[in-house]
Amino acid sequence: MIVRNYTNTLLELRTCEARYKLLQERREVYYVKYLGVRSPNIEKIGSGKNWSIDGMSVFLDLVGRVNEQTGMSLDDELELLAHQIAELNTVLKRIRAALRKMEGLEFQLYVAIVIDGKTVTEAVQEIAEKNYISEQAVWRYHLPKIREELEAIRRKK
């Protein structure tokens, strides 16, 4: 169960980070477009007359405008995502600490492969040496027990 929670939390973190990056880029595009060197005042038509608005007010309007899909402005959503990313990182640290304390070859294999980033072969060799068993036994009896979890992680990456 803890392995599945780790995987799901890690994927949720990656999703939040991707969304945060996307929104940061959108905010940057608005900034360059309306406050950049090449963007002086913008002409806007209002009440049948042409009148200009400075770029700062347009930029602030765009980042402060509430998105109908999310119900938040761009700045509010960025702030919320930053908070969620920090929270998920804290949760992942706790899960990693708990996984490292667990006994059992399957958990040791999982930690070596997923958290430490070792290849399956390196992890099997390390676990076999640490626990004084043959590599063949690890390949045959212990690795198949976590293979499904490892495949799920590879598919979701």
Question: Where do the protein language model's features map onto the residues?
Answer:
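Major-groove recognition helix of helix-turn-helix-like DNA-binding domains
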Residues: 134-148
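The DNA-recognition helices of helix-turn-helix-type DNA-binding domains
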Residues: 116-117, 130-131, 145-146, 153
